[in-house]
A protein has these predicted regions:
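Charged, amphipathic alpha-helical stretches
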Residues: 3-5
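N-terminal, charged amphipathic alpha-helical interaction modules
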Residues: 142, 160, 165-166
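Short, T/G/N/S-enriched strand-turn elements that build extracellular solenoid repeat scaffolds
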Residues: 9-21, 25-36, 42-56, 65-79, ...
Length: 173
C-alpha cells in the first residue's frame, strides 16, 4: 500500500510478469532516470526557482506559485501536492494541467498581495503600512474597529479580495 507509486514502462512490464498487486491512490508513469524532489512544509515556485527539466516535485504542505512562474512550471514532469496550492489566476489552467492535488487549490488575483492567516484584521496599524494595492486573503477581512479611518484607507487606494468581509455597522456605507 502506498499513496503515490512512480513507475516507468519497464517497471510496469516487470510488475506484470509477477503476481503483484499495487494498491495506491495514484500510479504515475515517469521517465526511468527522473529526479524526485520531496518538500515537507512550504515551497514557493517563482521565476527564480531552479529546477532540472523533467523533475518530479512532491510537496506535503503548501505550494505557493507566483505569477512569473509559468516557465518553471513547464519544466516539471509532474508536481504532486498533498495539501494546499496557492496559484495566481493567470496560471490556474497550467497548474490544473501540470499538478496532481490531494487537497485544496486557492486561486488569487494576479496582482494581489497575499496576506496569510485565517482572517486579516483591518485596523489603524494596517492603515500605517497599507499601499495602493489589492490585498487578498483566502478566508476573510475583518473591519470591526470603529476607530478605523476608512477615509484614509480609501485615500491610499487599497482594495480587498476575499470570500467574506465582516464590517462593524458604523463602518458600513
Amino acid at each position: 500500500d502506498c499513496m503515490i507509486a512512480l513507475t516507468s514502462p519497464r517497471v510496469q512490464a516487470l510488475l506484470s510478469q509477477h503476481n503483484i498487486s499495487l494498491d495506491s491512490m495514484l500510479c504515475k508513469n515517469v521517465p526511468e532516470e527522473v529526479s524526485v524532489g520531496v518538500v515537507n512544509g512550504k515551497v514557493t515556485l517563482s521565476s527564480a526557482s531552479q529546477t532540472a527539466a523533467g523533475q518530479v516535485l512532491v510537496v506535503n504542505g503548501k505550494l505557493m506559485i507566483t505569477p512569473d512562474a509559468a516557465e518553471v512550471l513547464q519544466k516539471y514532469a509532474c508536481i504532486l501536492v498533498n495539501g494546499m496550492i496557492y496559484c495566481p489566476q493567470c496560471l490556474s489552467a497550467v497548474v490544473s494541467a501540470r499538478c496532481i492535488l490531494n487537497g485544496k487549490l486557492a486561486v488569487y488575483p494576479d496582482d494581489a498581495v497575499l496576506l496569510p492567516g485565517s482572517s486579516i484584521k483591518l485596523d489603524n496599524t494596517f492603515l500605517l503600512r497599507a499601499q495602493s494595492r489589492l490585498y487578498w486573503n483566502e478566508h476573510r477581512f475583518l473591519a470591526v474597529d470603529s476607530r478605523l479611518d476608512t477615509a484614509a484607507l480609501a485615500a491610499k487606494g487599497c482594495s480587498f479580495s476575499a470570500p467574506k468581509a465582516i464590517l462593524c455597522a458604523s463602518l458600513a456605507p
